[in-house]
């Protein structure tokens, strides 16, 4: 009997594809570049929302956030309402599940390290192991196939600040400020260049973490039967995070699939982050529920490429701007309500 593939997901938080493999000449990303050289890179992958919890709710369910009531972000005080959910949590339709629940029911060991932030409370059935020590190495039977998620938080927006919790995020900036390309919608000032430099340093740090995970796969003899995904929830910085411009929803997407994808492949078809869930299920041979709105782009159940991707912005914290966006390969239409 052929062993089913393992799946390793590595999420870079708040991260536009400022990677060497995407043509960025400033970035120092050897692990990402190696992964892309051994697999495929998508140039038109997009998130369904430009902020954490709505975007992640779409990823974990394979559903548009606007379809399951998770399109708002941090929309309450965080206090519990009687014995019900916390006030900022949505209550999703009863038939919608975290797709890891389907994998678990089919025999996969599922671990998540460590962020959830789905805008709804993840059920106890979502993960075998969820927390700061979550790892495929914790599975009781090492013969079990696994789905392991690692969320690399160093690239989170908060680590672009000069200080965090009263301490400098980076005491010294190890990037030449003059080499940095400032987007035309930012003022070209020293402060802005320093913020962008911190972003590059955060990406470099996360790249090293990715390298450690890849070495762990090799050490465990798992690299040849593990499909590795790198993706992000949404973009960074002002005009990126929280806004459905390309700078806010364009996601890096790299997949290393030994014997399944030729190394160094560049693919330009449209992919939405809600397609990640059905794609993993397709690769693992797990039946997809009919209500799932994402479509598989790899594996036995892969579908035809999308014509359009969709994104939405709703009430985020105290801000209530309502925006919808649709994009094809060339144009994007954005509607403000």
Region spans (language model):
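Formylglycine-dependent sulfatase
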Residues: 1-337
């Amino acid at each position: 009997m052929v062993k089913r593939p393992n799946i390793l997901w590595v999420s870079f938080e708040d991260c536009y594809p400022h990677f060497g493999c995407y043509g960025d000449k400033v970035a120092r990303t050897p692990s990402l570049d190696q992964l892309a050289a051994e697999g495929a890179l998508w140039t038109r992958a997009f998130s369904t929302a430009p902020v954490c919890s709505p975007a992640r709710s779409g990823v974990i369910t394979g559903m548009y956030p606007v379809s399951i009531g998770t399109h708002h972000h941090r929309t309450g005080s965080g206090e519990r309402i009687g014995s019900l959910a916390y006030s900022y949590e949505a209550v999703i339709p009863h038939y919608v599940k975290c797709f890891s629940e389907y994998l678990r029911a089919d025999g996969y060991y599922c671990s998540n390290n460590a962020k959830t932030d789905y805008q709804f409370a993840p059920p106890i059935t979502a993960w075998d192991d969820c927390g700061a020590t979550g790892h495929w190495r914790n599975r009781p039977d090492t013969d079990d196939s696994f789905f392991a998620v690692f969320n690399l938080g160093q690239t989170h927006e908060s680590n672009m600040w000069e200080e965090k919790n009263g301490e400098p995020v980076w005491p010294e900036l190890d990037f030449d400020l003059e080499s940095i390309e400032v987007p035309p919608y930012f003022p070209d000032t020293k402060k802005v260049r320093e913020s962008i430099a911190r972003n590059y340093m955060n990406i470099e740090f996360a790249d090293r973490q990715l390298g450690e995970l890849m070495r762990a796969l090799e050490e465990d003899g798992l690299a040849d039967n593990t499909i590795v995904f790198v993706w992000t929830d949404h973009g960074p910085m002002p005009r990126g995070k929280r806004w459905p411009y390309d700078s806010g929803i364009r996601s890096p997407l790299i997949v290393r699939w030994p014997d399944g994808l030729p190394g160094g492949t560049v693919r330009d078809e449209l992919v939405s982050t809600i397609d990640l869930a059905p794609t993993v299920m397709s690769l693992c041979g797990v039946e997809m529920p009919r209500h799932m709105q994402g479509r598989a782009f790899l594996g036995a159940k892969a579908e035809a490429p999308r014509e359009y991707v969709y994104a939405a912005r709703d009430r985020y914290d105290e801000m209530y701007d309502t925006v919808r966006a649709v994009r094809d390969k060339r144009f994007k239409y954005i509607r403000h309500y």
